[in-house]
């Protein structure tokens, strides 16, 4: 679930890696909105198409991250304005998302997917806004419908 200072912001947001085949993302959006009765998000920031978003780093975020890492003596992420902002998408996607580690966890010496073309295809599903009463009520009263929409999108991939 997402939140916003404005209670009027609402709807489903599916975050993806940049420049992918959007077929699964489109199916997720279609099936979740149809089965759960939630609409597309009204959020316009990072929007690729209705309900689908790709969030990448901004120049100021890169500068801030570099400065913080330098101050703490860490090797910074090798990020650009094309790098996926969300860790779960960036770190599991292999070459396509530029998966890497930045030495914050000394026990992790290397990301096994950094040079792999078989990293998993990762999506971040934000099923509505907790700050919007309609979205929150819909989720609390229709959890099974949200799950049904997700299952309906994924099961054809394994048949």
Predicted regions and their residues:
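Active-site-proximal helix/loop segments of hydrolytic enzymes
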Residues: 1-159
């Amino acid at each position: 679930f997402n939140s916003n200072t404005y209670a009027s912001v609402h709807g489903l947001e599916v975050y993806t890696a940049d420049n992918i085949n959007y077929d699964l993302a489109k199916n997720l959006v279609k099936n979740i909105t149809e089965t759960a009765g939630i609409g597309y998000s009204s959020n316009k920031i990072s929007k690729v198409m209705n309900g689908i978003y790709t969030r990448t780093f901004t120049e100021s975020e890169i500068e801030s991250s570099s400065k913080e890492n330098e101050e703490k003596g860490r090797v910074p992420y090798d990020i650009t304005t094309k790098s996926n902002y969300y860790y779960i998408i960036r770190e599991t996607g292999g070459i396509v998302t530029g998966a890497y580690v930045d030495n914050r966890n000394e026990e992790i010496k290397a990301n096994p997917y950094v040079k792999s073309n078989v990293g998993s295809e990762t999506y971040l599903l934000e099923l509505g806004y907790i700050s919007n009463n309609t979205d929150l009520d819909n989720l609390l009263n229709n959890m099974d419908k949200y799950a049904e929409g997700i299952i309906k999108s994924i099961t054809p991939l394994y048949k």
